[in-house]
Every structure is written in structure tokens, then in C-alpha cells.
């Protein structure tokens, strides 16, 4: 079995560049663009808000909302027109959402894309994201 990313990143729980792994040789289409990290901020005055109740099909085997579903519910709330364009997605998972919880998806349309923030019933941020059109 091939060892992925040298396991050093996993043992130390550090950020690693996955494209340094030999498994990705020949898989990257075009150049890799180095980008600075994006700081997630609270949305002071959202453009809109859409509720989503976490249902059975949203949860994973741990009983938490599946990580892909956060992004799906965000883009269901508002999807920027980025078809055929390069985009950058920054996402920050803060607190797990559980079966039966209702998440409020706040979104803010910004000049270069859209910023999202999902909050649970206690007002805690579960997930935040930004889609930037490059």
C-alpha cells in the first residue's frame, strides 16, 4: 500500500501541500497558483438568509452533517455565476451540525464572489466559506 503524504503531516497535525505527494504527478491541469490564506469574518449585514434543517441524508457515519453538505446548502442559498471560470473556495468548519438542527445560511454578495456563514440555533457559526471568482 502506498504511503500518502509521507504521514509526517498526519502525525504532527500540520498543514501540508498535497501536491507535493508523488501520487499527484501528472494529475494537475495547468499551473498551481499560490494564494494567501483568507480570514473568515462575520457577515455584518447579509444580502440574504436561507434556513436548512439537517435531515438524515445530510449526516455521515459519525452522526454529524457531512462536510460536503455544508457547501451544497450554501450554494443552494445563493450560487454566483462562475460557470466556466476559475474559482477559489475557502471553507472553515467550526462546529458540527447534528441531525434535526436548523442552520441559517447567511450570504453576502461581494464584488469578486460571495461569502457564506452558517449558524446553528444557538447563534454559533458551524461553517463559513468564500467563493472567489479569479
PLM regions with names:
Residues 1-42, 97-100, 108-134:
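HotDog/MaoC-like acyl-thioester-processing domains
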Residues 90:
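Short aromatic/hydrophobic contact patches that present stacked aromatics
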Residues 9-87:
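Hot-dog-fold acyl-thioester-processing enzymes
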Amino acid at each position: 500500500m502506498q504511503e500518502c503524504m509521507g504521514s509526517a503531516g498526519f502525525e504532527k497535525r500540520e498543514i501540508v501541500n498535497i501536491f507535493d505527494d508523488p501520487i499527484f504527478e501528472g494529475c494537475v491541469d495547468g499551473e498551481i497558483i499560490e494564494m494567501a490564506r483568507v480570514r473568515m469574518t462575520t457577515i455584518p449585514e447579509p444580502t440574504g438568509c436561507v434556513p436548512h434543517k439537517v435531515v438524515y441524508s445530510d449526516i455521515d457515519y459519525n452522526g454529524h452533517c457531512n462536510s460536503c453538505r455544508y457547501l451544497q446548502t450554501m450554494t443552494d442559498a445563493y450560487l454566483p455565476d462562475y460557470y466556466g471560470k476559475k474559482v477559489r473556495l475557502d471553507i472553515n468548519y467550526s462546529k458540527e451540525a447534528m441531525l434535526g438542527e436548523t442552520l441559517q445560511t447567511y450570504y453576502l454578495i461581494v464584488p469578486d464572489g460571495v461569502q457564506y456563514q452558517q449558524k446553528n440555533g444557538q447563534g454559533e457559526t458551524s461553517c463559513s466559506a468564500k467563493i472567489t471568482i479569479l
